[in-house]
Amino acid sequence: FKTYICEYMDELSPAAKLMGAVNTVEIRDGKCIGHNTDGAGFVENIKNVGFDPKGKIATVIGAGGAGSAVFTQLALEQVEEIYVYNIKDSFWDSTEKRVAQLAEHTGVKVSLHDLNNRDELKESIFVSDLLVNATKVGSGELEGQSSIDEEMLHECLVVADTVYKPLETKLIKMAKDYGLVTAGGVGMLLQQAALAEKIWFGTDMPVAYIEKNFF
């Protein structure tokens, strides 16, 4: 639905246009303007744990809805380089084109890689400042699993997850046990909702209060 709704919008925000997905519709002067707050919510979440992505290197696992939002917004935030990892599925070619377009638009080095190439993945994480899981691994039937092995972590890494149920995924727990700074998915969930509320009503959602009392 986030993808299909784009064609019904009168305008798209820069982020929504690059992502090809809308999660928030603003009615302004009789026009429907499509926004995507997922990526910005993710960036706000990692900034809240003290990580500024500008000029950094990131490895993002997953190129679906969440992954696309994450790596697109990171590029808009002017990171130095992004390694995107995904399985070679039926969307591989279209993802490759989207990644190339993003790189051309932002001037950021963005590349797509096969998640099954574990040696290459390990090398990418080794040179990265930020590691993001933007897949469903860690939730639902995949709860208790991780796409990342502990040996791939290093002491200069910040680890983030887009999964918010459970509150602490295996990846986040593993990173915490390793002594790393982490950002769980519930923060992204709340931040993207706060950005949507700001667009709709012009009000500031009490994110810290909600997270403390309801999660």
What are these regions (language model features)?
Residues 79-106:
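NAD(P)-binding Rossmann-fold cofactor-contacting core
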Residues 28, 51-57, 154-155:
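Short helix-loop-beta connector
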